[in-house]
């Protein structure tokens, strides 16, 4: 937490914006939107070896309970409206992590007629995690970058 000053009496002085962002980074609740093989690596990152719980990241089954969406895998044209619908059900503020080459830009199936060439054409993406499939370490690094981005966001003026 970026603390502006600590007084000798045991008080901490900081802005409300920094405090709220600190609280949000310590309690990110992602909703999994696993579409292909990248979802297996996402499950791997949530398992005991990498333990995302230590960062305050707890997977939620419902979009109404989550503030972060991880889009992992190949996004087809038929799945595009469902992705947007789930994104619209998430409460504000909400963030999106695009995981894998297929979610980032179509990947191996870029020239296929039925593939959306990047989920950023459907929903705004905050962090891109590259790889085919990206490793669990890459996803953890991307989530830590998401936490840094949230920390630097101006929450109250939003």
UniProtKB/Swiss-Prot annotation:
Annotated transmembrane regions: none
Instruction: Write down the EC number.
Output: 7.1.1.-
Co-factor note (free text): Binds 1 [4Fe-4S] cluster.
Q: Which InterPro entries match?
A: NADH_UbQ_OxRdtase-like_20kDa (IPR006137), NADH_UQ_OxRdtase_20Kd_su (IPR006138)
Top-level taxon of origin: Bacteria
UniProt GO MF annotations: 4 iron, 4 sulfur cluster binding; iron ion binding; NADH dehydrogenase (ubiquinone) activity; NADH:ubiquinone reductase (non-electrogenic) activity; quinone binding
What broad class describes the main subcellular location of this protein? Answer: membrane
Give the UniProt subcellular location, in the record's own words. Answer: Cell inner membrane
GO cellular component annotations, sorted alphabetically?
Answer: plasma membrane; respiratory chain complex I
Which chain positions lie within coiled-coil regions?
A: none
Keyword NAD attributed: yes
* Reactions mediated catalytically: a quinone + NADH + 5 H(+)(in) = a quinol + NAD(+) + 4 H(+)(out)
For activity, the cofactor(s) needed are:
[4Fe-4S] cluster
Give the record's GO biological process terms. Answer: aerobic respiration; electron transport coupled proton transport
Q: How does it sit in the membrane?
A: Peripheral membrane protein
Nucleus as a keyword of this entry, yes or no, is no
- Key words of the record: 4Fe-4S, Cell inner membrane, Cell membrane, Iron, Iron-sulfur, Membrane, Metal-binding, NAD, Quinone, Translocase, Transport, Ubiquinone
- Where along this sequence does the record place binding of [4Fe-4S] cluster? 37-38, 102, 132
Biological function: NDH-1 shuttles electrons from NADH, via FMN and iron-sulfur (Fe-S) centers, to quinones in the respiratory chain. Couples the redox reaction to proton translocation (for every two electrons transferred, four hydrogen ions are translocated across the cytoplasmic membrane), and thus conserves the redox energy in a proton gradient.
Which HAMAP family does the record associate with it? NDH1_NuoB
Q: What is this protein called?
A: NADH-quinone oxidoreductase subunit B
**Organism field:** Bordetella pertussis (strain Tohama I / ATCC BAA-589 / NCTC 13251)
Lineage from the top down?
A: Bacteria, Pseudomonadati, Pseudomonadota, Betaproteobacteria, Burkholderiales
